[in-house]
Swiss-Prot record:
Disulfide bonds: none annotated. This is Protein MGF 505-9R. Belongs to the asfivirus MGF 505 family. Coiled coil: none annotated. It comes from the Viruses. Plays a role in virus cell tropism, and may be required for efficient virus replication in macrophages. It comes from African swine fever virus (strain Badajoz 1971 Vero-adapted). Induction: Expressed in the early phase of the viral replicative cycle. Keywords: Early protein. The keyword Glycosyltransferase does not apply. It holds the Pfam family DUF249.
Length: 506
């Protein structure tokens, strides 16, 4: 319970002159050695009608003098007990501390308010159960470097604690203490600073890590080169441009950076270095971009650096495109407003040669490729499976399919390819009922293209039709065979004519 006097003192904001010196002293509003006291709002006091102090500063001074009554007054005026404890520690007023100790709670809460390392240490000692490790940890939080300078030798040999404090200082970005620990104590895992710097994206911390690292090894050291390479890979992977530049100050290869930048589409990094590297490296980067399935903007940046000239490595490019099934660069070269570069046919040829049906169909849709082109390529490359599947999908009607296959044979020069298409036609007709005109046309077609076996098969099938018309067809085929010197076709046609003459009544 507050006394009446305390209630008056707590809420008195009036001028003190009318009260007289005796009343002021009886109210406890006189501070020995300083003068009368008057409350000014909630945060300040007026001392001796002249000096204005913050309530926290005032209670700290009063506590350092051991003036318990004035401390009590300032607590009524919303002064902080924490500053009272700090003041008592400064004046070594342990009786005052003892009185308020139970109200303090955790002494560690006072530590951030203390600037003097000696007072800082005294405050920490109030909790008798705390260890040196606790003192060091709070010193890191509050940037109290003198604590380390005073007791740092006690950490020598305690590798675990040194590592723990070092990493804590890195996480809290306390650069002064990091330097002191790094240069004065043996840190087992000095590289931990880099991992934390990457997470925090703290370039200052990152640079400090190299400063510490170079205190242990030279830039020619194999381990140092390995570390630099790892850092460059990670920084470029994450797009940390400033970190990349910082690492390159100490060594490392720009190529390491560029390949990661391409893979993860970090164009800012790529644009910075792309015009400083040889063309051969750019070509490798373009191939890597295909492998990594890079973005359109990344490809354009790379291609523009070589003026879109891909001729010197077009074979490697096509091989990589087909191998990784990523056609974006083919599309970009085709979309150029001027000087379009058409690699569609070249890529299609490799796809037909090495890829599956599904992959080829996807390419056909993407580049609007006619099925005839694909079927003819498949025929030249002896891909029987593709001929059948693509022609079946393109022309569901069998007669329509035969018509298109015949047109392809007519426009092809590749002998084996033509034969393959004609055998495909023959396989279709084996399951199709042809009328007389269709059967005769197909027979003549085989004669024109010197398909001996197929011609013989069709001749056997045509005997069911009108013999007179069939004989006329055979004479026509014989004329074609003689004109082109197709000996076997001529012999077959002649034999069939003789047989018809033999069985036909005269």
């Amino acid at each position: 319970m507050f006394s009446l006097q305390d209630l008056c003192r707590k809420n008195l904001f009036l001028p003190l002159e009318p009260l007289g010196k005796h009343v002021v002293q009886r109210l406890g509003l006189y501070w020995e050695g300083h003068g009368s006291l008057k409350r000014v709002g909630d945060c300040f006091i007026c001392v001796d009608k002249i000096w204005i102090l913050s309530i926290h500063k005032a209670i700290q001074i009063a506590a350092s003098e051991g003036n318990e009554n004035i401390v009590k007054l300032f607590l009524l005026w919303k002064g902080s007990l924490q500053y009272a404890i700090i003041g008592a520690l400064e004046g070594r007023q342990y009786d005052l501390i003892q009185k308020y100790y139970n109200q303090i709670g955790d002494c560690h809460e006072n530590l951030p308010l203390i600037q003097d390392p000696e007072i800082y240490e005294r405050c920490h000692e109030l909790n008798v159960t705390c260890t040196f490790q606790c003192l060091f940890q709070h010193a890191i939080r509050d940037n109290m470097l003198p604590i380390f300078q005073k007791y740092g030798e006690d950490l020598n040999g305690n590798r675990r604690m040194v590592q723990l404090l070092y990493e804590m200082a890195c996480r809290l970005q306390n650069y002064d203490i990091i330097k002191w620990i790094g240069f004065n104590l043996h840190v087992y895992n000095l590289e931990a600073i880099f991992s934390i710097a990457f997470v925090r994206k703290d370039l200052t911390l990152y640079s400090l890590g190299y400063m510490l690292l170079l205190g242990r090894m030279s830039t020619e050291d194999r381990n140092f080169i390995s570390i630099i390479t790892r850092h460059l890979e990670y920084a470029s992977k994450k797009g940390l441009f400033d970190f990349v530049l910082e690492s390159l100050k100490y060594g490392g290869q720009v190529d390491t950076v560029l390949f990661q930048a391409v893979k993860y589409n970090h164009r800012k990094i790529l644009a910075h270095f792309i015009h400083e590297i040889p063309r051969e490296t750019v070509e490798k980067l373009i191939l890597h971009a295909v492998e990594s399935r890079a973005s359109r903007k990344t490809f354009n940046l790379l291609l523009s650096s070589i003026n879109y000239c891909v001729n010197p490595f077009v074979k490697k490019l096509l091989h990589t495109v087909v191998k990784h099934k990523y056609m974006l660069i083919i599309k970009l070269l085709l979309e150029r407003p001027k000087k379009k570069i058409n690699l569609v046919d070249a890529a299609l040829f490799k796809l037909v040669k090495y890829s599956t049906y599904a992959e080829i169909v996807k390419f056909m849709k993407e580049f609007s490729v006619d099925p005839e082109r694909v079927v003819k390529m498949a025929a030249r490359l002896m891909r029987v499976d593709l001929i059948k599947k693509i022609s079946n999908d393109a022309w569901e009607n069998k007669l329509e399919r035969i018509k298109h296959l015949k047109q392809m044979v007519n426009t092809m020069n590749h002998r084996n390819g033509k034969n393959l298409l004609m055998y495909n036609i023959h396989n279709i007709t084996g399951y199709t009922c042809l009328n007389t005109k269709e059967a005769f046309n197909l027979t003549r077609f085989y004669a024109v293209h010197n398909a001996t076996c197929l011609f013989k098969e069709m001749c056997k099938s045509c005997f069911v039709h009108d013999k007179i018309q069939f004989r006329e067809l055979l004479e026509d085929c014989l004329h074609i065979a003689n004109r082109h010197d197709y000996i076997q076709i001529a012999e077959t046609a002649d034999e069939c004519i003789k047989y018809i003459d033999l069985i036909t009544p005269k």
